[in-house]
From Swiss-Prot:
HAMAP family for the chain: ATP_synth_b_bprime (MF_01398)
Main location (coarse class): membrane
Membrane topology, record value: Single-pass membrane protein
Protein name, UniProt field: ATP synthase subunit b
Gene source species: Exiguobacterium sibiricum (strain DSM 17290 / CCUG 55495 / CIP 109462 / JCM 13490 / 255-15)
Subcellular location field: Cell membrane
Molecular function via GO: proton-transporting ATP synthase activity, rotational mechanism; proton-transporting ATPase activity, rotational mechanism
Subunit (UniProt): F-type ATPases have 2 components, F(1) - the catalytic core - and F(0) - the membrane proton channel. F(1) has five subunits: alpha(3), beta(3), gamma(1), delta(1), epsilon(1). F(0) has three main subunits: a(1), b(2) and c(10-14). The alpha and beta chains form an alternating ring which encloses part of the gamma chain. F(1) is attached to F(0) by a central stalk formed by the gamma and epsilon chains, while a peripheral stalk is formed by the delta and b chains.
Keywords, ordered alphabetically: ATP synthesis, Cell membrane, CF(0), Hydrogen ion transport, Ion transport, Membrane, Transmembrane, Transmembrane helix, Transport
Annotated TM spans: 16-36
One CC-aspect GO term: plasma membrane
Organism phylogeny: Bacteria, Bacillati, Bacillota, Bacilli, Bacillales
Length: 177
């Protein structure tokens, strides 16, 4: 019986120790919770809030950067479209200017050709007039020479005819003056 009693006493003591252990553990745990709340929980919560604010700030910054990038891309696209339009307009203006220059050159060539033709016509007309004048002069000289020869031969033999011809000539010249 002794053993049974001792075993029962050991169990009761063990229960008592277990209960005391449990109470001490609970008290230590509660003290630890109070200390954690006072010293660690505030800084931990503050650190988590700061981290949360930092992450939110980074997200906002990233969102703003994304929006700025979208605006920049739109601006660049607009500038690119504007540059393409300006380039197309410049090419069109250059083409029109080249066509106008070509038309102007063609017109100038046509005018110069017409002037050259007209000048050639005038030169031909002038040369023809000179040739006609020279021909008339030659014909007149030839006619005079022929008439002189005829007159010499005819008047050389007839002195009365010569005298009448000279008188007639003098009368004609006096009448025209």
């Amino acid at each position: 019986m002794n053993l049974t009693y001792r075993a029962a006493e050991g169990v009761a003591e063990s229960n008592h120790l277990l209960l005391a252990n449990m109470i001490v553990t609970i008290v230590v745990f509660l003290l630890l919770l109070i200390l954690l709340k006072k010293f660690a929980w505030g800084p931990l919560v503050n650190m988590m809030k700061a981290r949360e604010e930092h992450v939110a700030s980074e997200i906002n910054s990233a969102e703003k950067s994304r929006k700025d990038a979208e605006v920049y891309v739109e601006q660049q696209q607009a500038e690119l479209n504007k540059a393409r339009t300006e380039a197309r307009d410049l090419l069109e203006a250059s083409r029109r200017q080249a066509e106008a220059e070509q038309a102007r050159a063609m017109e100038q060539a046509r005018v110069e050709t017409e002037l050259s033709k007209e000048e050639a016509r005038r030169a031909i007309e002038r040369e023809r007039a000179e040739a006609q004048a020279a021909l008339k002069n030659d014909v007149a000289l030839q006619a005079i020479a022929a008439a002189r020869h005829v007159m010499k031969t005819q008047l050389a033999t007839d002195e009365a005819a010569q005298r009448a011809l000279v008188d007639q000539f003098l009368a004609d010249t006096k009448g025209t003056n």
